[in-house]
Amino acid sequence: MVKAVAVLRGDSKVSGTVTFEQDSESGPVTVTYDIKGNDPNAERGFHVHEFGDNTNGCTSAGPHFNPFKKNHGGPTDSERHVGDLGNVKTDSEGVAKGVLKDSLLKLTGDNSIVGRTVVIHGGEDDLGKGGHADSLKTGNAGPRPACGVIGLTA
């Protein structure tokens, strides 16, 4: 089993932890998240971005991780970036906790997400269906209040 973690921090009150686990190279990755400081009762875009660079805040993380050059989509769409994880839903206190499984994410090999950045966005991801100019690139998910580089863990 391969495990990785990202500690989310940023220029805002949003913070949290995201863990990634993969039992085998061909198996899905289990993503567990606990993120606080968001607006209450909201959906927020949640993506893996290309670079593990946060030198200029979360902007330095670059675009969504997209090694297959696809359009943006939802996590269950066939046409999507590898890094498209959809939205997390916050509770009445602005906390998003949950678990998801994703078959495109990998923790080993050429398209590994280790060393890249996971970002929580300030708006809802329209999953590529919003009709906005940015829908097919970013899901029009807005700013990047918090992010963290994904690193291997024991």
From Swiss-Prot:
Keywords: Antioxidant, Copper, Cytoplasm, Disulfide bond, Metal-binding, Oxidoreductase, Zinc. It is found in: Cytoplasm. One of its GO terms (cellular component) is cytoplasm. PANTHER family: SUPEROXIDE DISMUTASE CU-ZN -RELATED. Its EC number is 1.15.1.1. It comes from Yarrowia lipolytica (strain CLIB 122 / E 150) (Yeast). Binds 1 copper ion per subunit. Residues 62-89 are annotated as: Disordered. It holds the Pfam family Sod_Cu. GO terms for molecular function: copper ion binding; superoxide dismutase activity. The gene is SOD1. One of its GO terms (biological process) is removal of superoxide radicals. Belongs to the Cu-Zn superoxide dismutase family. This is Superoxide dismutase [Cu-Zn]. Transmembrane segments: none annotated. Disulfide bonds join 58-147. Substrate binds at residue 144. Homodimer.
